[in-house]
């Protein structure tokens, strides 16, 4: 075999082995992003809500700093309840991974009847959070808080 071909083949194999250790992307968070965009046109959920307050994004500590942060806390609690459901306990059915179906028309979101028990539960968590987000003011001063001092 040509040494150049062998080098390319080796690089491809190493790349594939490396890619196999990359965890799957959270599919549900992408759906949740679309849900929010559907009901809050012009929003940028990943940018706007990631690292907001004490509960939006990866934070889960302390007291919510405002109404929007309380929405995220409630959403986190709903996901925790979903994980306690037997049908949602596996990795593929976890709240961050489980895909579900929904429709959005004129800003109204409906979780579809074809969802299984776990999908329906998670869809309703996301739907309730989306409704909460739509009614909560966004305070720029609560974006990228110093969690160590503000979220005790």
Curated annotation (Swiss-Prot):
Q: Where does Ca(2+) bind?
A: 55, 57, 59, 76
Q: Give the record's keywords alphabetically.
A: Calcium, Disulfide bond, Hydrolase, Lipid degradation, Lipid metabolism, Metal-binding, Secreted, Signal, Toxin
List the CDD domains.
PLA2c
Biological process according to GO = arachidonate secretion; fatty acid biosynthetic process; lipid catabolic process; phospholipid metabolic process; positive regulation of fibroblast proliferation
Highest taxon above the source species: Eukaryota
User: What are the required cofactors?
Assistant: Ca(2+)
Return the broad EC class: hydrolase
UniProt catalytic activity: a 1,2-diacyl-sn-glycero-3-phosphocholine + H2O = a 1-acyl-sn-glycero-3-phosphocholine + a fatty acid + H(+)
| Tissue-specificity statement | Expressed by the venom gland.
Which Cys pairs does UniProt list as disulfide-bonded? 38-104, 54-151, 56-72, 71-132, 78-125, 88-118, 111-123
The Swiss-Prot or TrEMBL record annotates one GO molecular function as: calcium-dependent phospholipase A2 activity
Q: What is its main location?
A: secreted
Query: Which SMART domains does its entry note?
Result: PA2c (SM00085)
Q: Which residues form the active site?
A: 75, 126
As to how many cofactors bind and how, the note says: Binds 1 Ca(2+) ion.
Q: Which family does it belong to?
A: Belongs to the phospholipase A2 family. Group I subfamily. D49 sub-subfamily.
Task: State the function annotated in the UniProt record.
Answer: PLA2 catalyzes the calcium-dependent hydrolysis of the 2-acyl groups in 3-sn-phosphoglycerides.
Q: What is this protein's name?
A: Acidic phospholipase A2
Task: Name the species this protein comes from.
Answer: Ophiophagus hannah
